[in-house]
UniProtKB/Swiss-Prot annotation:
InterPro entries: LpxK, P-loop_NTPase. It comes from Elusimicrobium minutum (strain Pei191). Belongs to the LpxK family. GO terms for cellular component: plasma membrane. ATP binds at residues 59-66. Pathway: Glycolipid biosynthesis; lipid IV(A) biosynthesis; lipid IV(A) from (3R)-3-hydroxytetradecanoyl-[acyl-carrier-protein] and UDP-N-acetyl-alpha-D-glucosamine: step 6/6. Keywords: ATP-binding, Kinase, Lipid A biosynthesis, Lipid biosynthesis, Lipid metabolism, Nucleotide-binding, Transferase. Transfers the gamma-phosphate of ATP to the 4'-position of a tetraacyldisaccharide 1-phosphate intermediate (termed DS-1-P) to form tetraacyldisaccharide 1,4'-bis-phosphate (lipid IVA). Its EC number is 2.7.1.130. GO terms for molecular function: ATP binding; tetraacyldisaccharide 4'-kinase activity. This is Tetraacyldisaccharide 4'-kinase. It comes from the Bacteria. The lineage of its organism: Bacteria, Pseudomonadati, Elusimicrobiota, Elusimicrobia, Elusimicrobiales. It is an enzyme of class 2 (transferase).
Length: 374
């Protein structure tokens, strides 16, 4: 069931709105109680003997969290800092009591056992060899990562509301297009907790900042600073890099596709993805949207091909990894994945981001540069 559509339908009448409001207040109470239990020792938080940096958000879906984790992991790994990602692996098949590890020869673990987002990240980071350890118990996953890989930094993927594993820094993403989830907690809005949770943040990334005007961005920053007066707020954008022609396994430039196209996705914020394609010059004549993390079937792919006709089809990397194994028997040509990366606006601002990941990062780079000059 598409929860977003269900919520919108319920909001169309007074009884539906009241029902969502009651559920939202119940959810809010649950978040308050959970936080209270951890803060007062009724539930235990655990530390590990290395730096832990959380990359998360206060709203559900669509902020660009996965691309931020990829940027953080690549930034650290390319600087020679041993890094691992800790993830829950949302909606994966939980067949293993032990953590699932994605690394090098263990990449044959498929997305069903690992989760679509961790599996996609493992593919994207294969060249810099960043392991990803997946388990619902993030402390158990962190312990496994430290034991196996001697990680200097653990990136806690989407763990801002997860208190079982202590962390050294919280990087929180806020979407400039819809920053505070309508001001209501789930399921009435998309907030995962009240805005007071921003007091725990050490750094905020205002994502999709190029899709909001300056006045709106300043208003968002003012609201953030009402909760956390001295926090650094950086602006980030999602930048298209290229298309990947999956049928021929080649990268093609962004100007390769123009005119009519079909698009399908099962992601948190499909509207942003579709707007990006329009900005790149595509006219979207067929659009398929599915709930986040949905598995694709052979029938889905056949439908896309039949209805798209001679027009190209475009999707995301996250969707691509969820194709059925025999997808090549169905998709013969004109199917593309849009590659997108996150960029921090400004060199000084990027250095602030890097220092939040690893406090000695700038000094480390200075030493590397001085050595290279010799």
């Amino acid at each position: 069931m598409d929860l977003e559509k269900t919520r919108d339908n319920l909001k169309n009448n007074v009884f539906g709105r009241f029902f969502l409001y009651v559920l939202s207040k119940g959810y809010e109470l649950g978040t308050i109680v959970n936080k209270f239990l951890y803060e007062n020792g009724w539930r235990k938080s655990y530390s590990v003997n290395t730096r832990v940096v959380c990359v998360g958000n206060i709203t559900a879906g669509g902020t660009g969290k996965t691309t931020a984790v990829l940027l953080a992991a690549r930034t650290l790994a390319e600087a020679g800092i041993r890094t691992a990602i800790i993830s829950r692996g949302y909606k994966r098949d939980k067949k293993n009591k032990n953590p699932v590890v994605l690394f090098d020869d263990e990449l044959e673990n498929n997305w069903v056992t690992a989760g679509d987002e961790p599996f996609m990240m493992s593919r994207a980071l294969a060249d810099v060899k960043v392991p990803i350890v997946i388990h619902e118990d993030r402390h158990l996953a962190a312990t496994e990562a430290l034991k196996r890989f001697k990680s200097q930094v653990l990136l806690l993927d989407d763990g801002f509301q997860h208190f079982r594993l202590k962390r050294d820094a919280n990087i929180v993403l806020i979407d400039a297009r819809n920053p505070f989830g309508g001001g209501q907690l789930l399921p009435y809005g998309t907030l995962r907790e009240g805005l007071s949770g921003l007091k725990r943040a050490n750094l905020v990334l205002l994502t999709h900042s190029n899709q909001a005007d300056q006045r709106k961005k300043e208003d968002i920053k003012d609201q953030i600073r009402l909760q956390n007066e001295d926090i650094e707020i950086l602006e980030a954008v999602h930048q298209p890099e290229h298309y990947f022609d999956i049928c021929n396994s080649v990268k093609v430039p962004l100007n390769h596709l123009k005119g009519e196209a079909g698009v399908f996705s099962a992601i948190g914020e499909p509207g942003g993805f579709e707007d990006t394609l329009k900005d790149l010059g595509l006219k979207l004549v067929k659009v398929w949207r599915y709930p986040d993390h949905r598995r694709y079937t052979e029938e889905d792919l056949k439908t896309f091909v039949d209805l798209a006709g001679e027009n190209p089809l475009v999707t995301t990397f996250k969707d691509f990894v969820k194709f059925p194994e025999n997808w090549r028997d169905i998709l013969k040509k004109n199917v593309y994945v849009l590659s997108v990366s996150m960029k921090i606006k400004g060199k000084k601002e990027f250095d602030i981001f890097a220092e939040a990941l690893y406090p000695k990062f700038t000094n480390l780079n200075v030493k590397k540069e001085s050595k290279s000059r010799k």
